[in-house]
From Swiss-Prot:
Protein name stated in the entry: RNA ligase 1
Organism: Homo sapiens (Human)
GO BP terms: hematopoietic progenitor cell differentiation; response to reactive oxygen species; RNA repair
InterPro entries found in the cross-reference section: RLIG1
The organism's taxonomic lineage, starting at the top: Eukaryota, Metazoa, Chordata, Craniata, Vertebrata
Effect listed in the UniProt record for changing E123D: Has no effect on RNA ligation activity, in vitro
Length: 325
């Protein structure tokens, strides 16, 4: 599986952004919108955006695969956030139009406690051995997904630590117009970040599964490359999102040669998301578990067992996958 950049922090927008004082269509109760101007940002230009690989921005929750307890483990995103007093000081500092990077944090006292197994995200800056909060006052990080942790039950549904495998959605290796759901060794995903999508994630924009039979999958970041993207102009991108079948996606993430990731979200361009007919649901999908040695070893209710029952079947679209339970 070809590796592109991994998502270890918030990605900047490809365009310079401006704040508009009107209710956000992305976040409820947010009284402002962050919109893209027509100017390509310095960060994007410095990262050589014109030579970058554009990929689909998938709407889910970010995950990471790295070692825990001497084996590959799935980790869930958990950002450390300031306690109430520190958050109040930080907000007052921002209201005075100061640069958030100049705010002084006492990491040991200003932040809510993290689980013992929490680790900071890879690219987090450190001073004197302490992670430095980002411009939002958060410290990005990860916690391992334990099998019986109810808080991360949807994460744990897509991994099996006994057989060290994960349920992954990607292009079929021999047909780029066909999607494939397969059981992938966790060792093949080490040090990669992925997006968890499904029934109980972010309002389920792709319409997967049902309340009775939830369905969740992992998608490696950068898995869906965009082949025919227009020029990097505001109006051309708006037209592409609105008029092209391939544009029925949440946004674009450019993977730059220096490892930098740059994005644009439909909301940056004043466009709606979620939308009724996504590009992800316009392509057929095949189930290819390839798990003979494990056939009888799965819990009867687990996702791996459900997918084994429909192994080698082809569906017109992801939405059509229904388990006969």
């Amino acid at each position: 599986m070809k590796r592109l950049g991994s998502v270890q922090r918030k990605m900047p927008c490809v365009f310079v952004t401006e704040v508009k004082e009107e209710p956000s269509s992305k976040r409820e109760h947010q009284p402002f919108k962050v919109l893209a101007t027509e100017t390509v940002s310095h960060k994007a230009l410095d990262a050589d955006i014109y030579s970058a690989i554009p990929t689909e921005k998938v709407d889910g929750t970010c995950c990471y695969v790295t070692t825990y307890k001497d084996q590959p483990y799935l980790w869930a995103r958990l950002d450390r956030k300031p306690n109430k007093q520190a958050e109040k000081r930080f907000k007052n500092f921002l209201h005075s139009k100061e640069n958030p990077k100049e705010f002084f944090w006492n990491v040991e006292e200003d932040f809510k406690p993290a689980p013992e197994c929490w680790i900071p995200a890879k690219e987090t800056e450190q001073i004197n051995g302490n992670p430095v909060p980002d411009e939002n006052g958060h410290i990005p990080g990860w916690v391992p997904v334990e099998k019986n942790n109810k808080q991360y039950c949807w994460h744990s549904s897509v991994v099996n630590y006994e057989f060290e495998i994960a349920l992954v959605l990607k292009h079929h290796p021999d047909d780029s117009g066909l999607l494939e759901i397969s059981a992938v060794p966790l060792s093949d995903l080490l040090e990669q970040t992925l997006e968890l999508i499904g029934t109980n994630i972010n309002g389920n924009p792709y319409g997967l599964g049902s309340k009775k039979h939830p369905l969740h999958l992992l998608i490696p970041h950068g898995a869906f490359q965009i082949r025919n993207l227009p020029s990097l102009k505001h109006n051309d991108l708006v037209s592409w999102f609105e008029d092209c079948k391939e544009g029925k996606i949440e946004g674009i993430v450019w993977h730059c040669s220096d490892g930098c990731l740059i994005k644009v979200h439909r909301h940056h361009l004043g466009l709606c998301w979620p939308i009724p007919d996504t590009y992800m649901n316009s392509r057929p999908v095949i189930i290819n578990m390839n798990l003979n040695k494990c056939d009888s070893a799965f819990d009867i209710k687990c996702l791996f067992n459900h997918f084994l029952k429909i192994d080698n079947q082809k569906f017109v679209r992801l939405k059509d996958i229904i388990f006969d339970v």
